[in-house]
Regions:
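Nucleotide-activated sugar donor-binding and catalytic core shared by glycosyltransferases
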Residues: 1-182
Length: 182
């Protein structure tokens, strides 16, 4: 078609380049100075209900960290609060990029958030758990080696993926230990 085009950048990369670690983020959100583990449980209630309890089970093992959950717009705070069992868990809305910018590590639901987390250079564990029947059907229809965008783009396991039965407290703790000690 011979159109004249000019590449001017990507809005996500522009947004990320403007983020800096900020003590004001801690103060405004009533967070302590303890390091943050970001938790991105997804945007649909059904996926949050399945994954968030496992994700937040890590808080008891890491009392010197704050687990900060990036809450999805449109889901009321009370829905998230049913999952709070530890003192070091906080829920924030509309601050996903600020959470990532200030995180030492992240536990992330498979999807666009995995790529965003990687662009912030935050070590992550990618989590996916759905209904068994949906998972089995998808495995038959879709033939991919990985579920995270990071791994798909790189065609290599750059970030650890915990899928279905592998997403459990024991495995997640093992992988988070590796991230936090490397």
């Amino acid at each position: 078609h011979d159109y004249q085009v000019t590449y001017v950048g990507h809005p996500l990369l522009d947004e990320i380049s403007n983020k800096v670690k900020n003590s004001l983020f801690y103060k405004v959100n009533n967070l302590s100075a303890e390091p943050i583990i970001g938790v991105l449980p997804g945007s649909r209630k059904q996926e949050i209900a399945v994954k968030l309890p496992v994700m937040l089970s890590m808080a008891k093992y890491y009392p010197k960290f704050q687990f900060v959950v990036a809450c999805a717009p449109g889901i009321e705070k009370s829905y998230y609060e049913q999952f709070v069992r530890e003192q070091n868990v906080f829920y924030l809305f509309n601050q996903t990029y600020d959470i990532l910018q200030n995180s030492e590590a992240a536990i992330v639901t498979s999807g666009t958030a995995t790529l965003e987390t990687a662009l912030f250079n935050v070590p992550q564990i990618v989590c996916y758990k759905g209904s068994l029947i949906s998972y089995l059907i998808a495995r038959q229809l879709i033939k991919v080696k990985y579920i995270s965008l990071v791994n798909l783009i790189m065609d290599s396991e750059i970030v650890k993926e915990l899928i279905q039965a592998d997403l459990n407290e024991k495995n997640l703790k093992f992988e988070l230990d590796k991230l936090l000690t490397s």
